[in-house]
Amino acid sequence: MSNDEKQLTKEEMKAIKLQAKEEAKMNDLLKERRQKLSDAQERGKDPFDVYKVERTHTSKQIVDNYDELEDKIVTVAGRLMSKRVHGKAGFSDIYDRYGKIQLYLKIDDVGEEKLKEFKTFDIGDFVVITGKVFKTKTGEITLHVTKLELIAKSLKPLPEKFHGLKDPDLKYRQRYVDLIINQDVRETFMKRTAIIKAVREFLDNKDYLEVETPVLSTIASGASARPFSTHHNALDLDMHLRIATELYLKRLIVGGFEKVYEIGKDFRNEGIDVRHNPEFTMIELYEAYADYNDMMEITENMVAYACQKVNGTTKITYEGTEIDLTPPWRRVTMVDIVKEHSGIDFSTVKTDEEAREIAKEKKLELKKELKDCTKGDILNALFEEYGEKKLIQPTFVCDYPVEISPLTKKKRGNPEYTERFEGFIYGREICNAYSELNDPIVQKDRFMQQLKERELGDDEAYQMDDDFINALEIGMPPTGGMGMGMDRLVMFLTDSPSIRDVILFPTMKPTPNRD
């Protein structure tokens, strides 16, 4: 055994001993808390026998209305988060949904027995407090306690500092603890709700109709992604969780709903990183008689509206970079952005073979074999390699190749491209939009081409959807459509570095069970 291995063994033994010591300490704390619960139950004061609490105010209401409530009696409820009681008096803090309210206890007001009982309360316990509103000499709004009651017992101690925990993923695995400890996390998720509300408000004000479409279907289409699959026992039918809402929403356009949107969960059986979670929230919207230019206008104004609503401005700081979301956003073609950042003028490339030579020269990473790549595939790869990360300020990249846009109308005046754009902020895609293809003959041909792509090994290529073709044959008017990842929008508007920071319970690999 080498010296390094001996040293490693010593370190491991030290860690094991430390863990055993910490576990023993934790076991003692758990026993102590359970004993306190047992003692309370023996006194006929089982906190778990409390069914309903009548509180008169929240912490926010007291702070916001202090002038009216000064010297008034109020009742609040929340989690005990600090306790500083010495002798016959002391201060404590409880937290509710909105934040903190300070308590002042004095033996003359609550009595000796109640003060003694309060001293047995633990950090994390839930209490209901009645008291008079006043300000301390330092100006802090406080309740002078006259009544108190334990209404739920915390049997496990909270971590004192979340960042001191050994498992860096614990805040995602046990989000309930993260929400208790970190006020800024609570604020992020409250802001998330406000952002989604603002988006709804914006679209409702423009006479869009919110709808719901199936989450389970026999065909997973509307996006380039692998689905999650399941089996319906009663129907003996293989089904998939949706990867997009697009094709159902377009059916509603066919049916006469001229402006529709849906905010809901999509599911894609793909990797997990700072921008991707297998279960995520999307908004898709479609408007009859509109095109992708209208969708650009809707998109930039919707984002700016939501940002103004929740942040009071259309300017944000994301990971230290100032970003201005004020419309209008920059518009640039994919060909031009590739030329700007790589020097390659793709408008002069005439054949697939010319494009493949460029791909070889630039050593591009491609999603399929070079011999199977078209001009469009290679242009997109050049954009991803040279252009995408440079788009810090809000930018609409327009006119994508037809080969990678199977649901999109061809560009007016240039049929090699389509009327499609993607929006980028901080080098990241935030939305995807089209002048929607409504020609059933062309759409069926595009689906057939996608089937060939699947045969070549692209399991993210679109599947054939015969019923959607049937809907197009019934007739769909010219339509503009847009899809946006709501989680990514929330990331930007809350300055959150990871998608897991804006999803309450992100997908995580299970931890081994411990006895």
UniProtKB/Swiss-Prot annotation:
Could you list this entry's UniProt keywords, alphabetically sorted: Aminoacyl-tRNA synthetase, ATP-binding, Cytoplasm, Ligase, Magnesium, Metal-binding, Nucleotide-binding, Protein biosynthesis
Its EC top class is ligase
Q: Which residues bind Mg(2+) 2?
A: E429
Q: One MF term from GO for this chain?
A: transferase activity
Q: Which cofactor does it need?
A: Mg(2+)
Q: How does it assemble?
A: Homodimer.
Q: What is this protein called?
A: Lysine--tRNA ligase
Q: Which organism is it from?
A: Clostridium acetobutylicum (strain ATCC 824 / DSM 792 / JCM 1419 / IAM 19013 / LMG 5710 / NBRC 13948 / NRRL B-527 / VKM B-1787 / 2291 / W)
- Organism placement in taxonomy: Bacteria, Bacillati, Bacillota, Clostridia, Eubacteriales
